[in-house]
Regions:
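Membrane-embedded beta-strand positions of outer-membrane beta-barrel proteins
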Residues: 136-140, 174-176, 204, 218, ...
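Outer-membrane beta-barrel channels and translocator barrels
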Residues: 33, 165-168, 179, 209-213, ...
């Protein structure tokens, strides 16, 4: 049976009035899923690819709703939730996965059954929990090169061990994953393999059950990767049906991501319900370099620095009162992001510009982002076959930004707060360096619908939401 998360409970996917594709751990193992991109081919109306010019940055779309940008301040249209924690940026999302309990892909607007609202849909990633019995698992795989004249082997090692630390009170789990990929392509400009990547993930989890009605589940993970930049093919040079690539800047991606979550579940007699609290923290430090023009010439090369620090908390209650299933909750999210972009373009120096100064493009931005949300939904059974769906959400968002235009200027860093946002550009007379701004938004969004069970195996449903 494939299940999906509805409210705080787990239900058969056939009974949930949401367009959802769910994968349990056995299915994920059978499909050999090691990243989200792998699921694009098993899910209708869903694309989980990355942005071609920025490795690891999500370009997710569901039912045609998505974005195609590496700018981290653009909010995700498709929300990614890891162990119930919303990931606030697209950067550092398309990365390796292991030891998964389930993945659920929800199509359409979300926001009444869990914290953050999204317009295109949501991807719910649930990593493996500690077990009350001793278990271990290890796997080693080697993928050989497809062709003798390009690429190298792709080797993956992973292991998990789980079991009770204090019987009936405390369970623990530890997992480690390492991938060494020699690359899939050959760079014809240098005769080297292209696409090399090293990735290491270490994850620990503890589950504490002080009483029969109270459970704490904490997880901590560190993700590090070092790889070449994106593998771009310029079709003005090579046929699109070939694997030929020639670039003079193989680029790089350096990622260091720390993630933690703490989930608390308290069973209460009120409505035979559950109070759930989910706290999440994520910190990202990333640097990149990419050959955007995808040629052996220096026409457009780009580098970036990116940092993110986010904190979130979601508190919700889910219970049943006679014919009504009720979910209510509140959500708080805050993040600080900083992004520096550097561009190497073959632009002509102005006449008289000193040869001792670098003519390079620098700029970027910093953003403080805060979100509050209150949400609720009631599923009321009019009959044994017909259920009404009624929901309401209030959301408030605030953004505070400092921007430095990406223009020729002395070397600076938004991450290190050395790029000016006021005054004028010393390289271009009269041009402002940037600006600062602040704005906020609030909205009440309703949801109404009907669900009808024709048979035990067939349902019809329709919903309206703003």
């Amino acid at each position: 049976t494939v299940t999906a998360t509805k409210k705080a409970n787990v239900e058969n996917v056939q009974d949930v009035p949401v367009a959802v594709t769910a994968f349990n751990s056995e299915t994920l193992d059978a499909l050999k899923v090691n990243d989200l991109q792998s699921l694009s081919y098993s899910t209708p109306n869903v694309s989980l690819e990355d942005v071609g010019t920025s490795k690891g940055t999500a370009n997710f779309s569901i039912r045609g709703l998505g974005i195609n940008s590496s700018i981290p301040s653009i909010d995700p249209t498709v929300g990614v939730f890891v162990d119930g924690v919303y990931i606030g940026v697209n950067s550092g999302v398309v990365l390796d996965l292991f030891d998964l309990d389930s993945v659920e892909i929800l199509r359409g607007p979300q926001g009444l059954l869990f914290g953050r609202n999204t317009t295109g849909g949501a991807v719910l990633i649930n990593t493996g929990n500690p077990t009350d019995e001793f278990r271990y698992k290890a796997r080693a795989t080697v993928e050989t090169p497809i062709d003798d004249d390009r690429g190298g082997p792709n080797t993956t090692l992973q292991a998990t061990v789980s079991g009770p630390l204090i019987e009936d009170k405390l369970n623990g789990k530890l997992g480690i994953y390492h991938n060494f990929d020699d690359g899939y392509f050959k760079n014809l400009a240098t005769d080297d393999n292209l696409g090399e990547a090293h990735t290491t993930i270490v994850r620990g989890a503890l589950e504490w059950m002080p009483t029969d009605t109270l459970t704490f589940l904490g997880k901590v993970e560190n993700f590090q990767t070092s790889s070449d930049g994106p593998n771009g093919q310029n079709r003005g040079f090579y046929d699109r049906g070939s694997f030929d690539i020639a670039i003079n800047n193989p680029g790089f991606l350096e990622n260091d991501i720390t993630f933690g979550s703490l989930r608390t579940d308290l069973d209460v007699g009120f409505g035979n319900g559950t109070i759930t609290n989910v706290i999440g923290y994520r910190e990202v430090d990333s640097t990149t370099s990419a050959d955007i023009d995808a040629t052996p010439l220096t026409l457009f090369h780009s580098g970036s620095e990116f940092t993110q620090e986010q904190f979130s908390e979601e508190l919700r209650y889910s219970g049943t009162f006679d014919r009504a299933d009720v979910t209510v909750g509140g959500f708080y999210f805050t993040q600080e992001i900083a992004y520096t972009e550097r561009r190497d373009l073959p632009t002509t120096r102005p006449v008289g510009f000193p040869a001792s100064l670098d003519w390079e493009f620098n700029g970027g931005g910093r953003q403080d982002h805060t979100v509050y949300g209150i949400f609720g939904q009631v599923d009321y059974d009019f009959t044994e076959k017909l259920t009404g769906i009624f929901g309401l959400r209030y959301g408030y968002e605030e953004k505070d930004v400092d921007i430095t235009y990406v223009r020729p200027r002395p070397n600076c860093s938004m991450v290190n707060e050395t790029c000016p946002t006021t005054g004028t550009n010393p390289y271009i007379a009269g041009e402002p360096n940037g600006f600062s701004d602040k704005d906020d938004w609030s909205e009440v969004t309703p949801k109404i619908g009907l669900q009808y069970f024709h048979t035990d195996d067939t349902q019809f449903y329709g919903t309206y939401t703003k």
